[in-house]
């Protein structure tokens, strides 16, 4: 995959770049649904591949065959290049080595590449800088928060996510109801007990901040697991209701008491709209954007808004002209991976979109839409009741009997009526089976059963049961058109054609 540093950025000359980027943005929007489907299928096959069980197979050869097939469905070597396959493997491993809380946060952003994961983590580090805390995260999914010494006025606090050993006791909280642990907060080199200060987590802005959420959940988890143990580094005073300097209960007291009354990892924050529950209030706030339509992330260039920061980052590529995703077959570059994936189907011949009318398949959805118009053009007669189209007016007239209840075709034997003439013919066969024709019956009816065709055309050799059918057929060779329309004057060879006209 071509890196962004190697990408050539087109300059705006005479407004051409804006038009080109706008067209590409529209093209990408049409493929959003397909991208979501492809991403979901790829993740499903990845999970099947990782969680494959040997006991489900009859032997080692079948197990190997199924593993190969699952791996192929996940990595798609027929569509992806070697660089793209390596990128998928690195992305999976990168998400795996992240601690539970960070992993859950990153996966909520739905990153498509490792670069987007790095961007999300760098944003998190900057937000931790603003809080003035240093977060040191262990690979065993344990987290330790250390307070940073006050720096000089001209110095800016620095924070980074480092892998250090944390005190055992409480697991990291994440999607799978894991819990966090917080070590003693240090000022200088001297450890001291942890106490929540008034106003530390006040305000909606702090709850929405991922960095503050990490620290808050870790502190609450430590309090909930060890409310009165001195060995945990938190005194009995710290497990009591929170009070400010004047002895008044802190605003965070109610949240703290609520957290202590439940088991850690329980989903207690429920959505009033759809009933979905979350372990943290900040996650609920983010989820409510789906119902309220809130889009806090705005593009400074075009003013378009988004619900998630990562989507905004992907959108900005449209304005910068950056095209990091390049096709190895033809060299064409694209601003987004979804557009490249859609383009590569042209080379692979893969066709996902099928026409329900004729079964023809297409690589792109736009091709299917264009093809469907041809079916509509060939069927100009449309039913006003159900919008079904027909290529003949007579067929439309017969179809409308379904809605009106009219049944013009009646059986002479039993009096039963039908909407279509073909239905009547099928019904009459039941009477013919019950009453087979004898030698004394009409000759014409006997020929219908014996399939005898005594009348033969001298020009082409085609045979007919009835003489009138032969006469009408011979008019094709003579060019005679005896049936003429009284209104338009157009002439026809057969009466049925005039009736249809």
Curated annotation (Swiss-Prot):
Cross-link (Glycyl lysine isopeptide (Lys-Gly) (interchain with G-Cter in SUMO2)): 20, 26, 197
Positions in coiled-coil regions: none
Record-annotated SCAN box domain positions: 51-132
Molecular function via GO: DNA binding; zinc ion binding
Major place of residence: nucleus
SMART domains: SCAN (SM00431), ZnF_C2H2 (SM00355)
Name of the featured protein: Zinc finger and SCAN domain-containing protein 12
Biased composition (Polar residues): 180-194, 241-253, 437-447
Primary role: May be involved in transcriptional regulation.
Region (Disordered): 175-194, 223-255, 429-450
ZnF bounds (C2H2-type): 269-291, 297-319, 325-347, 353-375, 381-403, 409-431, 455-477, 483-501
This protein's encoding gene: Zscan12
Annotated Gene3D superfamilies: Classic Zinc Finger, DNA breaking-rejoining enzymes
Family: Belongs to the krueppel C2H2-type zinc-finger protein family.
Tissue specificity comment: Testis specific.
Keywords attached to this entry: DNA-binding, Isopeptide bond, Metal-binding, Nucleus, Repeat, Transcription, Transcription regulation, Ubl conjugation, Zinc, Zinc-finger
Places the protein is found: Nucleus
InterPro entries reported in the protein's UniProt record: SCAN_dom, SCAN_sf, Znf_C2H2_sf, Znf_C2H2_type
One GO CC term, this protein: nucleus
